[in-house]
Amino acid sequence: MKILVWIIGAILGALTVAMMLTAGWEVPPIDSDQTGFRGTGMVEVNNPRMAEARLQEQLAVVPQSSPPPTGPGPTAGEIYQNVQLLGDLTVAEFNHLKQAWTDWIAPQEGCAYCHQLDNMASDELYTKVVSRRMLEMNWTINEDWDEHVGETAVTCYTCHRGENVPQYGFYNSDAEAHGGSGMLGWTAGQNRPAEEVGLTSLPWDPFSDLIEGDDSIRVVGRTVLPEGAPIGSMQETERTYALMIHMSEALNVNCTYCHNSRNFSTWESSTPQRVSSWFGLEMVRQVNAEYVAPLGSILPPERHGPTGEGRKVNCTTCHQGLPQPIGGMSTIVNYPALQGRGKTAMSSDLHEEDFAAFASAELHQQQQSGDDD
């Protein structure tokens, strides 16, 4: 009997040690910032060391960029063949942007990731067709979704971070593959903890219906007593909560970053960030529906998920654990061609003015050097 007690005690002790070592404990002190009336739970809780480490880790790998070239010159459309979208850039501007794309998306493969090196004009590689469509998506985001991206804007690097395919996103789930049969019952697409929804038992794929599709996210009524048609079933409510958990994890924030703890559903007392997040959700819906999902038909099998479709975009694709992607750092400063369709090239007057200023500065520097000698 004593041996059995010792064995049970040893097992419990080992489990306790394992829990203490693997439960993700954080060392105090923890910062808490009050964001609303005191005593209402309106507070943001963060581990300042982990938050700073996460930010510095992302900043450390941002590729260096050089100022855009200035001065007049022939356009890319005049010199190169099959330049469908950036033909009004000068050759220097065009190549400057192309080098950035290489650094952002294919630093190992180089130009060969999208181009046939013996015929750069060819559209034979699917990656070139995809990249052209992604440029149009980049323009749409920066032109039409200022309420979400602001002046920081986005570039290819915002999502790709040096990878051919962005590290984060989602595939449409195959519910049948995880569904029970017979006495095992039906899983209803949940109760299988997934990192995308914070390892909860909530539905692991709230994305297909809510940010690829256009199902209503709201499941809370606007009146005290229910009126009219039901707003959301229990399953739809769990799906919405799964999406909210995903947003919290993607930005590394609490619920009160957007919502007022007194009444989560009311807009009047919500924080300004809730407005930005609403535009962000609508933006992601458009990006998935109009740009990302349609490209699935030209992707090779190795790029497909369990349902035969390509990977889609969610909040983590850009944010990666920060309230603002890359801590709010803008990577578009030296690449005005990515700001929108109407900004693909600076005016010729500006080219000449900048070139003249540059030449004058160079001449002045040479004269100074001559005087010093």
Where are these regions (language model features)?
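N-terminal export/targeting leaders of redox proteins
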Residues: 1-113, 118-373
